[in-house]
């Protein structure tokens, strides 16, 4: 991939969370996409590139976006729908396997997990554990809602991308868009809503001691 590959001198945090099966994984992926800018903003710590301050809290994603099949994934109706997409790419010689799909969030093609790939690599182990705990709780909460037949709104990728850009540019100083209310709100309020959303599964997963995002 020429200069695209040569410029890929970046480090990110990848977190795998186990899921019961791939069908459930796709359903979780569809919903969890909405929360990607929320966790991305907390992790932003890559403002410099080639000795310059880029003006972004996280420039790493801008570098990785040069590759194909990156960014926020589209909505898929089912695992079969996703497989059809992969098969088209394989048949046309675009990729040789699904591991060449590098979205910010993906159902892993080999392991029984859903993989979060959006975050910068934190500078402290405490921050890493906190982010991993939040991602685990997001997956558990969405799965719990599915088991209770409670729906959560699916937001379009073009909307989620607006919040991702804001998180990349401003980090925790961003105002993210509340798509339900159609207003921009301070990140702190968005974070409060996320923590409230996952609160009932935090203790079930024994994540309370790790989920200390306010200490960042």
In which residue ranges do the predicted regions lie?
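C-terminal accessory/tail domains of diverse enzymes
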Residues: 3, 64-216
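Short strand-loop junctions, especially beta-strand C-caps/beta-turns
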Residues: 16-20, 119-121
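Conserved hydrophobic/aromatic beta-strand scaffold that supports enzyme active sites
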Residues: 14-16, 113
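Metal-dependent DNA replication initiation modules
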Residues: 1-13, 20, 26-73, 77
């Amino acid at each position: 991939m020429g200069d695209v590959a040569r410029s890929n001198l970046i480090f990110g945090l990848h977190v795998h969370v186990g899921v019961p099966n791939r069908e459930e994984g796709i359903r979780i992926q569809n919903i969890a996409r909405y929360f990607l800018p929320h966790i991305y903003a907390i992790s932003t710590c890559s403002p410099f590139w080639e000795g310059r301050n880029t003006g972004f809290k996280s420039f790493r994603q801008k570098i990785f976006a040069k590759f194909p099949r990156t960014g926020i994934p589209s909505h898929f109706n089912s695992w079969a729908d996703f497989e059809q997409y992969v098969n088209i790419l394989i048949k046309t010689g675009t990729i040789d396997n699904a591991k060449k799909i590098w979205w910010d969030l993906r159902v892993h093609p080999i392991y029984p997990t859903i993989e979060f790939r959006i975050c910068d690599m934190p500078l402290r182990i405490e921050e890493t554990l906190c982010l991993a705990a939040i991602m685990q709780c997001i997956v558990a909460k969405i799965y719990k809602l599915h088991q209770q037949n409670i729906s959560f709104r699916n937001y379009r990728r073009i909307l989620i991308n607006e919040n991702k850009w804001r998180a990349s540019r401003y980090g925790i100083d961003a105002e993210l868009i509340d798509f339900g209310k159609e207003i921009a709100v301070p990140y702190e309020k968005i974070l409060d809503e996320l923590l409230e959303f996952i609160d009932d599964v935090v203790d079930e997963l024994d994540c309370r001691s790790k989920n200390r995002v306010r200490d960042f």
